Amino acid sequence: MYCHIKIEVLYSLFIFSIIFEASFFLVNAFGLEYDNTVEIKNITEDVCLKYDNITRTIIICGGSVNIPSISSYFNNDLLSMIGPNEWLLKSNIMILENAALIIDGSYAKTLKIDSDYSNNLPYSIISRGNLKIDNTKILGWNSTSNSPPLVISPETIRPYILTFWNSAGTTNITNSYLANLGYKGYVGTEGISYLSGKGSLIVNNTIVGNYLGVQLLNNVSNILIESNRISNSYNEGIKLDTKTNNIEILNNTINDTTLHAIVCLRECNNIDIKDNILQNNIGIAILIDKNGNNVTMENNRIESNTMGIMISESKDNIISNNMIDKNGNGIFIKKGNENSIIQNTISNSNNYGINIYSNSSWNRISNNNIKNSINSGINIAEYGTQNNKFIGNIIEGGLNIGLKLDRIINNIFDSNIVDKNDKQDYYIKASSGNVVRDSLFNNTSILFVDKNSNLKVINTDNSLLSGNNVTNMVNTINNTVEIKPIQNITRLTSLDMQVFPNSSYVNISSINKDFSKNNHYKKWNTIFPETIQTKFVIGGLVSGNQYILKTNKTILDLQSVGKDNNITFNYTNDELIYQFELEATKTPMFITLLILSMLIIASVVTFFLLRRRRRIKENNLKNR
């Protein structure tokens, strides 16, 4: 794409050089004179004006002029007054170095620039010097119909304002109304464009119906774009492209663009996008793409766009304290690293609140409030998405899933609240090595959808893990939840649950196994911390039954005791226990009856044998 832009720019230069051949470009560059360029005489010493009759171009080659002073030297066919302080321009104006044009409301309240369809080229104002537009209206105009140009397609020819290559001055546009400018042609024809320069101001304007609102590219720097109202653009509202840097975009309102509101492409650096209102744009409210670095997006109100904020192939950007409501995705990071998403309020997203996707790593997502997302509050997906930290976020009220982990590894979720989401709070697919800690679990549902996923839940101090539904969809023995410490775990429906206890206890209750029958057991894979006193209270047992607790270190015979039918297992060891099994050992009833019957028979036989022996003994005594 970068090469494509360069080729397009070179082609534009070629077109311009042909259009202005033997005119002001060559005059300015080489000091050559051509018959079609006429210098205007009888003007002040510090002002230089020329006219190119082939390209219909008024050339300001020195000094400072305004619209009425230009008109006084040319006939009405080029620049004419059509009403009180209202002017119609039917030519190009070119401002060279060391020259300036002032379009001021004091002398030109309205400037209409005609569209010339005869040679398929619009009229334009092109500056390589200084251009000041203040307190005026500049309108694209069709003098034949006496109305704005009818836009049939993006290529419909309309006038434009351009700060050209190697500009030595500034183009300041303030307190003005600019409308119906620009078209999809060559680089710089899009509406209001800066191809070079630094230190310009674009402040407190209303920009309506341009092909592109404002465009900066090719190392443009130190531009302030503030307090503008940009609407109904056929492309972007504000576009920064190709190594633009040190740009401030502050307190603007951009709405109803056909594409994106604000775009930063190809090595844009040190950009501040703050306090803007971005609404009802068909594309993305803010797009940072292809090595856009050190961009700060702060305190913006972003509402009802196809997407809120997207960062792609860029790093070291900050998204903070934004209000993001009713967008497709609230915030989307794709192949982005080391970005920070902090303290945003994201609500009513039609897809994901925050989507971290496709080889995005080392991002920090903290203290965001995410509510009422239709798909997932936070979605983390695709291989290579790893080592991200999610800290202190609130994810609640989603119509589907709260926190979705899809093919990711080694991410940390710390001190988050994931609650009151309709289907699952945690959804885990083909993901491992992810850690949840210091998080509140209350009526939390966790769904595993494949055999190799696991989730570590640790350091949930003073939190109650109760009433939760940990479900293994495919009923394998590989899915794990690791819990540490002080937890009450209920409804263990997976066969392989990991438990991390500490010096307090873990209460495992409501086990979904029948322990009253022989040869049935419950198995957990676990890791007990080294040199820590561990106390397990295992409930849901049958009073009076005998149980065997087997670990990789010891086998204990335990008798269930207490009114709650619990058994208690205390363990202290310097080595890790990684597995224990609980097995019911009570003898089945039919064996018990058989043994009792045999005992009764044996007793009867013994009784009769003893009785017979006694009689024999008595008879022997009588015979003596």
Pin down the residues of each PLM region.
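Surface-exposed beta-strand/loop patches in extracellular or lumenal glycoproteins
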Residues: 527-544
